[in-house]
């Protein structure tokens, strides 16, 4: 398995016993899979891709289901991916995510990655699985500003990246976000 590898569709259909509703299961590998954080879209606006994280390689990596064919495309191959950080751009041109070493933008056509910001040192994450501790990021509705929780010097900050101007600034110097 590796970045750019295309896997056959794993779609399974089930019928809910109580409602009779048809339910589509996107993945069937025997491992952990999860969607992005609850306020992060799992699709681009054109619904070309369904984005999810799979641990099928033994560590979390980002995949996209190609909606037209159902095939699964592995998008990342990073040993220190922050699994809750993924955020697709609304236009579907890019996928944004972080690793312990930086903030990345992946071109969905070429699968070329660009490091937008290199983290000079690994940000200290807050203990737990809530808020900034999960590394969840968010993107403005116009696909211009990406917000990333970071921690350094024992303090929490929000890093804002202007994706058009390629500039950054930090805000919120607190003990926790």
Locations of regions flagged by a protein language model:
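Blade/loop signatures of beta-propeller domains
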Residues: 1-24, 157
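Beta-propeller domains
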Residues: 15-19, 49-77
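Repetitive beta-architecture junctions, highlighting loop-to-beta-strand starts
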Residues: 21, 60-62, 70, 101-103, ...
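Asp/Glu-centered strand-loop micro-motifs enriched in Gly/Pro and often flanked by an aromatic residue
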Residues: 25-39
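Signature of short aromatic-glycine-proline-rich micro-motifs recurring in repeat-based ectodomains
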Residues: 35-45, 129-137
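Asp-box/WD-like beta-propeller blade repeats and closely related beta-sheet repeat scaffolds
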Residues: 75-89, 93-177
């Amino acid at each position: 398995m590796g970045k750019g590898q295309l896997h056959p569709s794993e779609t399974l259909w089930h019928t809910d016993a109580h409602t009779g509703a048809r339910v589509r299961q996107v993945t069937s590998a025997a491992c952990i899979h999860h969607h992005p954080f609850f306020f992060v879209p799992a699709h681009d606006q054109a619904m070309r891709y369904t984005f999810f994280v799979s641990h099928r390689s033994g560590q979390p990596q980002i995949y996209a289901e190609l909606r037209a064919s159902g095939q699964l495309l592995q998008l990342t191959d990073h040993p220190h991916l922050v699994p809750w950080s993924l955020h697709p751009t609304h236009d579907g041109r890019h996928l944004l995510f972080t690793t312990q070493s930086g903030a990345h933008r992946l071109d969905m056509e070429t699968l070329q990655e660009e490091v937008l910001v290199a983290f000079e040192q690994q940000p200290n994450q807050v203990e737990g699985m809530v808020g900034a501790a999960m590394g969840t990021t968010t993107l403005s509705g116009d696909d211009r500003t990406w917000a990333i929780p970071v921690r350094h010097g024992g303090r929490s900050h929000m890093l804002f990246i202007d994706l058009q101007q390629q500039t950054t600034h930090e805000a919120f110097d607190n003990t926790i976000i």
